[in-house]
Amino acid sequence: MDRIIEKLDHGWWVVSHEQKLWLPKGELPYGEAANFDLVGQRALQIGEWQGEPVWLVQQQRRHDMGSVRQVIDLDVGLFQLAGRGVQLAEFYRSHKYCGYCGHEMYPSKTEWAMLCSHCRERYYPQIAPCIIVAIRRDDSILLAQHTRHRNGVHTVLAGFVEVGETLEQAVAREVMEESGIKVKNLRYVTSQPWPFPQSLMTAFMAEYDSGEIVIDPKELLEANWYRYDDLPLLPPPGTVARRLIEDTVAMCRAEYE
């Protein structure tokens, strides 16, 4: 339940509007509310980090509004809370009116939801399930440069799960669509909430089965097999993509060194 911010309130401040985050000096604000001109605003506590509250404030600032990507180097737990705040702020902003009857809605006091007092419909934040998979062939890993990555970063394959599809089917389909190959021996590794804009990444490792690389030019600039000790520029630490790549490299080292 949200409340009015008081002078001595302190903690981490996720000030967000339209999927942007307020980052004075390029950092997530931490300290007393008075130091950031937040007294009198409404805030919702969305978690705790190292014993300190993390607050969401739905507000646009004139300056220093940026992407949550800018704080990706934070500790994973704090980054995830910042992402939670950005997603919740957008959820509340985009669900002011009921999609069924058009009446104004109000936030629940017991959970992250919006309620319609007219037709009693209940809305929750949208979460888009995605798969991400590291594919190994002997001492090499399949890495691709995506069209959205113009900085030379190479990463593993990923994509959204479609309606009526299992996670395993999504892996097989996405890999075939983007690279033209088949995989086998799929193994679940971990998951990571990813606020771009509201994804839940479900991470797998797989082995190459058959086929030659034929990329989808709408998705990829290039894709290739890279030996574990000769890799291109990789995603930053803390991302699930980097975790998958490092796990694959560790497996290759154990087998080939």
Curated annotation (Swiss-Prot):
EC number(s) reported in the record: 3.6.1.-, 3.6.1.22
Residues that hold a divalent metal cation 2 according to the record: E174
Presence of the UniProt keyword Manganese in the record: yes
PANTHER family noted in UniProt: NAD-CAPPED RNA HYDROLASE NUDT12, NUDIX HYDROLASE, NUDC SUBFAMILY
UniProt binding sites for a divalent metal cation 1: A158, E178, E219
Protein family according to the UniProt entry: Belongs to the Nudix hydrolase family. NudC subfamily.
Binding annotation for a divalent metal cation 3: E174, E178, E219
Subunit note: Homodimer.
Gene3D superfamilies noted in UniProt: 3.90.79.20, Nucleoside Triphosphate Pyrophosphohydrolase (3.90.79.10)
Keyword set, alphabetical order: Hydrolase, Magnesium, Manganese, Metal-binding, NAD, Zinc
Protein name: NAD-capped RNA hydrolase NudC
